[in-house]
Amino acid sequence: MAVAVRTLQEQLEKAKESLKNVDENIRKLTGRDPNDVRPIQARLLALSGPGGGRGRGSLLLRRGFSDSGGGPPAKQRDLEGAVSRLGGERRTRRESRQESDPEDDDVKKPALQSSVVATSKERTRRDLIQDQNMDEKGKQRNRRIFGLLMGTLQKFKQESTVATERQKRRQEIEQKLEVQAEEERKQVENERRELFEERRAKQTELRLLEQKVELAQLQEEWNEHNAKIIKYIRTKTKPHLFYIPGRMCPATQKLIEESQRKMNALFEGRRIEFAEQINKMEARPRRQSMKEKEHQVVRNEEQKAEQEEGKVAQREEELEETGNQHNDVEIEEAGEEEEKEIAIVHSDAEKEQEEEEQKQEIEVKMEEETEVRESEKQQDSQPEEVMDVLEMVENVKHVIADQEVMETNRVESVEPSENEASKELEPEMEFEIEPDNECKSLSPGKENVSALDMEKESEEKEEKESEPQPEPVAQPQPQPQHQPQLQLQSQSQPVLQSQPPSQPENLSLAVLQPTPQVTQEQGHLLPERKEFPVESVKLTEVPVEPVLTVHPESKSKTKTRSRSRGRARNKTSKSRSRSSSSSSSSSSSTSSSSGSSSSSGSSSSRSSSSSSSSTSGSSSRDSSSSTSSSSESRSRSRGRGHNRDRKHRRSVDRKRGDTSGLERSHKSSKGGSSRDTKGSKDKNSRSDRKRSISESSRSGKRSSRSERDRKSDRKDKRR
C-alpha cells in the first residue's frame, strides 16, 4: 500500500505542474491569470459606476451640479402656453418693422446709371466678315484651350482606371487580410477553448488523485491498525472484543487461528473493494475525456468545412471581380457539353420510343394477319362442308327414289283389309298435312314434297295403328321455334327412351335451302336457295331393320287411340287451314293419296300426284285424303298382329327421338356458320321460316318412317 500511495503522490505532482503550464498559456492568450477571480461587488461597481446600478450615477451627478449652484440655472416654464408665446413674438416683430421704416425714408439713396445697353438688331455682312477675319487669334486660343481640356480629360481617365485597379488590389488585399484575421481569430478561439478544456481535465485529474491519495492513506492506517489486532482472539458476539489469555492452551490456540482466518478474509474483502472503487474513479474521467474528444473532433470538422466554404466564396468573388475570360470560356464550353449530353440523352430516349412504337405496330399487323388467315380458313372450310352436305342429300335422294319404285311394285299384292286402318288415322293425316298447306305460299315446289310426304305418312300410320301403346316418356324440348309442333306430337304419340344398337345413325346437316324440299330434285333446290335463309335439314340413312315376328292385336285399342289423336290434331288443323283451292286439284290429290295408301298405284301416278298437289288447296286435300286413308287403314289393321306392330312402334318412336335430338344439336352448332357463308336473310318472313323449319323436321321423319314400314310389310308378306 505504501508503494501505491507514493505512485499516486507522484501523479498528483505531475498533474499540478501540467496545470501550471496550461495556466501560463491562458495568461499569454487572454492577458490575465485564470486563477485570479475578481469579486462580484467589484464587477458590479465597475459596470454601474458609483451609483451601483444602471443610470443612478448620472442622477447623482446632476443633483450635485444643481445643488452646487455653479451650473446652469433651472428651466423656467412658461405658464401661458405656446400660443401666447408665438403671438407675442409676432407682435414684437411688427413693432420693430414699424419703427425702422421712417428712419429709412429720411436717408436718400444716390441714383445709379443702368448698365443695360440696347444692341443693334441687324448685323451687316461686313461685320460678319470682319469677325471671321479677326478670329485667327481666337482660333489658336480655342485650339489651345481645347487641347488643354482634352489632356485633362485623358489624365482624369487614366487616373480613374489606375484608381480602379488600385482599389481592386486594395480590396483583394483587404479581403485576404480579413480572411486571415478570421482564421487567426478562430485559431485563437480554438486554442483558448482547448486550453480551458485541458485545464478542466487537469483539475478533474487532480481532484481524483487527491481522493485516491486520501483513500490510500486511510487504507494504510486501517491496515496498520488491523495488523495489530490479528494477534488477539476475537469474540463471536457483537460488539467484537479482542483478548489474549495469560496461558496458552490448545483451545485458545484454535481460537486464535480461527480469529486470524476471519480477519484475513476481512482484509482481502476490504482490499478488493478498495481496488474496485479506485477503478471506478479512474473510469469516470476517461468517459468524460472521450466525450470531450468527440466534441473536439466534431468542432474541428465544422471549422474545416467553414474554412473551405470561405475559400470557395473568396475564389468566386475573385473570379467575378477580375472577369477572367478564360474561366468564362471554360464555363461556356462546359455548358455546351452539358447541352450536348442532354440532347444526346433526349435523342436516345426518342429512338427508344420510336423502336417501341414500331414493335407495337408490327405486333398489331401480325395479329391482324393471323385473324384474316383464320377467317379465310373458316370461310374455305364452310363451303367444303356445304358441298359435302349437298352431295349427301343427292345420294340420299337417289336411294330413296329407287326404294320407292321397288316398294310400289311389291306392295301391289297387299290385302284390301288395310283400308280400314287408314280411316282411323284420318285426323293424324290432316294435322301433318296442314303445315304443308301453310308453307304453300313460299314456293310452288313445296307442294310436291307435301304430296310425297302424305303418301309416305299414310303407310307409316297404317302400321302404327296395329302396334300396342308403350309407356309414355316425356320428350326433351327442342329449340323454341319447334315448341308448338312438339307439344302436339307429345299429346298424340308417346315416345320411347332408348334406341337399340341395330338402328342406323341419322345425319344432321346444315344446308342453305328451305327444309320442306329435301326429297325434291336438285333443279328445285337451286332457285329456292336464294329466296330463303339458312335452315337445318334432317337427312336419314337407309335403315336396315332386323326380322320381326307377327302377333295379332285387338282392334278396339287402336281405334280409340287413333281417334283421340285425330281429335287433337283436327283442332290445330282447323285454326291453320286456308280455304282456297280448285276441284281438279282435289280430285288428283285424292287419287294420289288413295293409291299410295293402298299400294296399288305406280311411279307414274306418284309423279302426277306430286305435280297436281303443287296447286291444290289445303281444305280440299284434307277432306279427300282423310276419307280415302281412313278406309284403307281400317282394312289393313284387321290383318296385322300384335307383336309386329309393337316392335315397329318402338323402332319408329326411337327414330323420332334421335332425329329430334340430332336436329337440335345440329341447329345449335352449324346454324350460325352456314347462315354467315351463304344465303340472304328474309327479315319479313320470320313466321314462314319457323313453319318451314318444323315442316323440314317432319318431312325427314316421315320419309324415314315410311321406308321402315314398307320394309317391314315386305318381310311380313314373305313369311
Curated annotation (Swiss-Prot):
GO terms for cellular component: catalytic step 2 spliceosome; desmosome; nuclear speck. Residues 482-500, 578-632 have a biased composition (Low complexity). Its main location: nucleus. There is a cross-link at residue 157 (Glycyl lysine isopeptide (Lys-Gly) (interchain with G-Cter in SUMO1)). Pfam families: Pinin_SDK_memA (PF04696), Pinin_SDK_N (PF04697). It is found in: Nucleus speckle; Cell junction, Desmosome. Belongs to the pinin family. PANTHER family: PININ, PINN. This is Pinin. It comes from Pongo abelii (Sumatran orangutan). The gene is PNN.
